[in-house]
Amino acid sequence: MKVLFATGNIGKYHEAKQILARYGIEVERVDLDYPELQSDSLEEIAAYGARYCAESLGQPVIVEDSGLFIEALNGFPGPYSAYVFDTIGNEGILKLLEGEENRKAEFISVVGYCEPGGRPVTFTGEIRGRIAEEPRGEEGFGYDPIFIPEGEDSTFAELGVEEKCKISHRTKALERFAEWYKNNVAGR
């Protein structure tokens, strides 16, 4: 079984490849630049992206959109996480939280799947945690150096990709997709 993953993010691709391999699903990356829907809903963004890519490629495809929701910042950056990271980075987020005791945060990932002419299906995964006082660790990408998952003392970047892929928001969303895919699409 093989699925196309439309993403320009090589880190996401490697994580998806590792996670979906457990289900016997091979992942092929397609670097398709598609317009991102401006919405406060990760589900809407992922569904739109999946439909757009499936129609553009003429093949079934998955996309993934994720957001970091920080409680003290009223859920910011949320669905705008990629833009905010590119604009102010981890240092900017830490600056916004300077002096803030409430560092609770949640990472949410939504995987969207669509076939050409079909309706998109979405799968959500989430993980609670907190924002570190400073960036820590070398592995991963994006907000990994500042996000500490609940029950851990290490950031995602300190845990490393293999450990992160056992517990992350993206893992949960991809596992939900994989179960659905095996039961509804594979072998058709």
UniProtKB/Swiss-Prot annotation:
One MF term in the entry's GO annotations: metal ion binding
The cofactor named in the record is:
Mg(2+)
| Matching InterPro entries | dITP/XTP_pyrophosphatase, ITPase-like_fam, RdgB/HAM1
**Catalytic center residues:** D65 (proton acceptor)
Q: Keywords on this record?
A: Hydrolase, Magnesium, Metal-binding, Nucleotide metabolism, Nucleotide-binding
Q: In its UniProt record, which GO terms are filed under biological process?
A: nucleotide metabolic process; purine nucleoside triphosphate catabolic process
Question: Which Gene3D superfamilies does this UniProt record tie to the protein?
Answer: 3.90.950.10
Q: Does the keyword Thylakoid apply?
A: no
Q: Where does Mg(2+) bind?
A: E36, D65
Return the EC number.
3.6.1.66
User: EC class of this enzyme?
Assistant: hydrolase
- GO CC annotation terms, alphabetical: cytoplasm
Domain of life, per lineage: Archaea
| Cited Pfam families | Ham1p_like
Where, in this chain's numbering, is substrate bound?
T7, G8, N9, I10, G11, K12, S66, F141, G142, Y143, D144, K164, H169, R170
- Give the co-factor note: Binds 1 Mg(2+) ion per subunit.
Q: Which reaction does it catalyse?
A: XTP + H2O = XMP + diphosphate + H(+); dITP + H2O = dIMP + diphosphate + H(+); ITP + H2O = IMP + diphosphate + H(+)
Q: Which CDD domains match?
A: HAM1
> What family is this protein classified in?
Belongs to the HAM1 NTPase family.
The record's function comment reads: Pyrophosphatase that catalyzes the hydrolysis of nucleoside triphosphates to their monophosphate derivatives, with a high preference for the non-canonical purine nucleotides XTP (xanthosine triphosphate), dITP (deoxyinosine triphosphate) and ITP. Seems to function as a house-cleaning enzyme that removes non-canonical purine nucleotides from the nucleotide pool, thus preventing their incorporation into DNA/RNA and avoiding chromosomal lesions.
Fill in the subunit field for this protein.
Answer: Homodimer.
The protein in question is named: dITP/XTP pyrophosphatase
- According to the entry, what is the taxonomic lineage of the organism? Archaea, Methanobacteriati, Methanobacteriota, Methanomada group, Methanopyri
